[in-house]
Amino acid sequence: MPPPPHIKPENVLKRAQELIAVGQAPAALTVLHEHATSKRTRSSPIASLEPVMLLFVELCVDLRKGKAAKDGLYQYKNIAQNSNVGTIEIVLKKFIELAEKKVTEAQAKADEIQSSLESAAPSSNVEDLEAIETPETILLATVSGEQSRDRTDRAVVTPWLKFLWETYRTVLEILKNNARLEIMYQTTALQAFQFCLKYTRKTEFRRLCELLRNHVQNAAKYSAQMHAINLSDPDTLQRHLDTRFQQLNVAVELELWQEAFRSIEDIHTLLSLSKRPAKNVMMANYYEKLARIFLVSENYLFHAAAWSRYYNLLRQSAVTLSTNQGSKKDHPSVTEADMTKAASFVLLSALAIPVISTSRSRGALIDVDEVRKNKNTRLTNLLGMLQSPTRAVLFRDALNKGLLKRVRPEIRELYNILEVDFHPLSICKKVTPILKKIGDDPEMEKYVVPLQQVILTRLFQQLSQVYESVELKFVYELAQFPDPFQITPSMIEKFIMNGCKKGDLAIRVDHISGVLTFDTDVFSSAKALHSGSAAGSAESELGSVQRLQNTPAEIARLQLTRLAKTLHVTCMYVDPSYNDSRLQAKQAALTRAAAGAAKEHEDTLERRVIIEKKKEAATDALQRKQKEEETRKRIRTQQLQEAEKQRLAEEQRERELKRIKDEQDRIRQQELKKQLEELKSGVKGIDLNEIDLEDLDANRLRAIKLAQLEKEKNELTERVRATGKRIDHLERAFRREELKHIAEDYEAQKKVDMEIYERQKAQTLAEAEAKHKEAVALKHRLSRLIPVFSSFRKEVSEKRHEEFEKRRKAAEREFEAKKKQRVKEVQERRRREKIERENAERAKREEEERIKREEEERAARDAERRRILAEEKAKREEERAKMDEIAAKQRQREEEAEARLRAKRAGLSEPPRTESEVRTAPRLNIAPRTSGGPSWRERQAAKEAAGGAAPEAPKAEPEPPRRTGGYVPPHARGGSDAAPPAGNRYVPPSQRSSQPPSRTQTPPTSSPKPEEPKPLASGTGGKWVPRWKQQQQNQ
């Protein structure tokens, strides 16, 4: 069954617009809210949901329903964040714009109300001008109160300001920790900062900063979520840094110094996470705001350190820009005036650092000092310094960078007076004009008070070195400052008491005698200032206080030191051997050190290698452990995710089935109720109170309805028949009575129509006559203007004709020029096209010729290659033929040698030969044939017996040299199967005869010319010889 029609976004939007049109905006908002928060909305297309959400936020703003807007927008973000992020930004921007528009309208309304009240006040009637403020008016104003500006804003503007703040907070909560909506998040945060700055909302600004801080902390906590932001991404971190810098600027503008300091800490934390260095323009703003914060907190030491860092950054930017190594947008614009101003503030802030510690007392507890030390370490880290700054270090750094050349003259003179040539008796006279100049500058005026503290400290320190007691009047005369910055005696006494309390001064004030007595206790302890105090110390490292002479306490304290030095010098002069032994001991120590330096260096290098190896091993082990842990964690996470997905899928399936069943039941109940309501309202006479809805179905309801409708139809037909019959009688009676009065009525109507006609006719004639007279008078009045008008028209026509001719000729000339230019361009284009076409044809022709030439060259190369291959093949065939011939000859020689060898072996049993018997050919000892055929000797004897004398044996060729080794050359190895000489050559089994030669075989009788041995038969293991060759050999 399809869902109800109102579930579709288009139908919901249409229904809401209808409700708005009839003035039911709350009901429309309820419909839109139910649709936006419904689970069925998730399957709706985003394109159809966007108009619904735009109308929804508009109604939420009009009705100031922030919570409903938050619920709907959360649901819409969950629906659209995976498919279309742009629509979320559109809806949220619309939400913010509408809220801001409402605030603007409320302000305009408040201004209008206030202006109306102010304009109405002077016009009020006053009975007595001299007694305007009567007791009654005062009481009335106190009880009721007037419509003042604050009250108007509170009633009109403040609710919308609150709603706008809730809007910003809602949007930030919706967009937080989402990488796809990050840019919109940063933009909204900047808008919220501007809202707080524009309307001076300090409380909301604090809450906004805390909200953003929690979002960043939660980003690292929930980094495994889908679409979570990654602070390791440089672009994401840069956007957060930009937002924090804007937060810092707004905090400074609102003078919320604590929140500004927390913003500084946030920026420092983000900078520590950043892999890329921050831009100089951002760091310049960072140090400038940090200096202002330290100044407000009266932390002059770190204030001066921040100015020093700021000046270093300006110097670095100036050098970078002068060498064109960086872009101007990444560096602050630096001019000579800016450098002079920054240098002046660096030196002035360093001079204003108190010499007496303002944050330590004699009885300071250890834990308090530890907390202060931790605080200073944290401030040092914020400045990016390696160690805590001191007054002496800042002065030395300023002098090394040549700041005295850049500062303003009065600041340079003040430095010389206070730090170089301090004279207590004339200090105030010298400083007075300088303080006046500093006091005239609004930015430097705030340094006057700390400078006075420094001057007083210097004054009392040097007076204590010269005098034991001075008059109070004398001290008051010395401490005279310019009029706006005059110091009273009570302020001087307060300063003395503070210095005594902190342990930096030892002064007693006797008001009876009017004398200041400096402490002369020779056993008083040294007053070393705390190195980690927030205000720093002037006496650290270099001792910047000029020492006029030692005090009695210092003399007593250093007595043992002086005695030791004097005794040492005396021993050196009295006993020369003491000095010699000292020098020898020193030389021996140097020798030992030189001897052990090399070994120590090697040991150090070995230890370094061992340490590096251990570090690498530990690092590898740690990385392996981390990888294994990450793998296990990932596997476990995947398993949990899979289990969670499966569980959610099961739950979703069950919920879907239950929802479908419930929806079906709900729809069935709704249809039944709807049909019952239709029966109750449309069909009368049915009693449905006793019918149970659970037993009803659609068929039974339809049958009840049809029966009742049939009954009503019959009753209606009967009533209509009776009523028609009654009406017919009445109509006939009415018409019978009307016939008597029709003629009278017609005459009266004719008379009335004639009177109306005459009256309208007279009125029309009068209006026409008056109009005609007016037209004639107008004609006579305007006829005097006809000659002037004609001449003017003729003059204008001539001028316009001349101008037209000029323009026409100019247009013709321009047309001809453009025509010639066009013809020239066409000719040039055709010529260029022709040249390009010819070039293309020539290139094509050259390409074809090149291809043809390459084909011919390729064919020639192929023919040459074939010819060479044929020649090589012919040569190989010829060489093969030669080798075959040589092999045949070699085989023949070997067979002859084998035959001779065998004949020699066979002749051992024969009688010894005579000397007259000469062998002309070798005699072969042929193995007996295994087959049943006759041997060659028998065949030869048979031929002779047949009467044919045997042909003369050919002349024996000289016997080739006999090979004694077993090596056979390759050409003879494959072409001869003759056996090597006995005992020297291996005969394979396949070539051996089946039976060994018989030693008892009687060889044939010797003849002067024995026959040439024939080739062996195939059965004896020799090489196969073709038949034609056998016949040729037999012949």
UniProtKB/Swiss-Prot annotation:
PROSITE patterns, A to Z: PCI
Entry's localization field: Cytoplasm
Highest taxon above the source species: Eukaryota
Stored Gene3D superfamilies: 1.25.40.860, UVR domain
Annotated Low complexity bias: 943-953, 988-1004
GO biological process, one term: translation reinitiation
Cellular component terms per the entry's GO annotation: cytoplasmic stress granule; eukaryotic 43S preinitiation complex; eukaryotic 48S preinitiation complex; eukaryotic translation initiation factor 3 complex, eIF3e; eukaryotic translation initiation factor 3 complex, eIF3m; multi-eIF complex
Coiled-coil intervals: 92-121, 606-910
Compositionally skewed regions (Basic and acidic residues) per UniProt: 619-632, 809-901
Region ranges (Disordered): 619-649, 809-1035
InterPro entries referenced in this protein's UniProt entry, alphabetically: EIF3A (IPR027512), eIF3a_PCI_TPR-like (IPR054711), PCI_dom (IPR000717)
The keyword RNA-binding belongs to this UniProt entry's keyword annotation: yes
Main location as per UniProt: cytoplasm
Residue span(s) of domain PCI: 339-523
GO molecular function, one term: mRNA binding
Keywords: Coiled coil, Cytoplasm, Initiation factor, Protein biosynthesis, RNA-binding
Subunit comment: Component of the eukaryotic translation initiation factor 3 (eIF-3) complex.
Summary of the function given for this chain in its UniProt record: RNA-binding component of the eukaryotic translation initiation factor 3 (eIF-3) complex, which is involved in protein synthesis of a specialized repertoire of mRNAs and, together with other initiation factors, stimulates binding of mRNA and methionyl-tRNAi to the 40S ribosome. The eIF-3 complex specifically targets and initiates translation of a subset of mRNAs involved in cell proliferation.
HAMAP family: eIF3a
Family statement: Belongs to the eIF-3 subunit A family.
Protein name, UniProt field: Eukaryotic translation initiation factor 3 subunit A
Organism: Emericella nidulans (strain FGSC A4 / ATCC 38163 / CBS 112.46 / NRRL 194 / M139)
Lineage summary: Eukaryota, Fungi, Dikarya, Ascomycota, Pezizomycotina
UniProt gene name: tif32
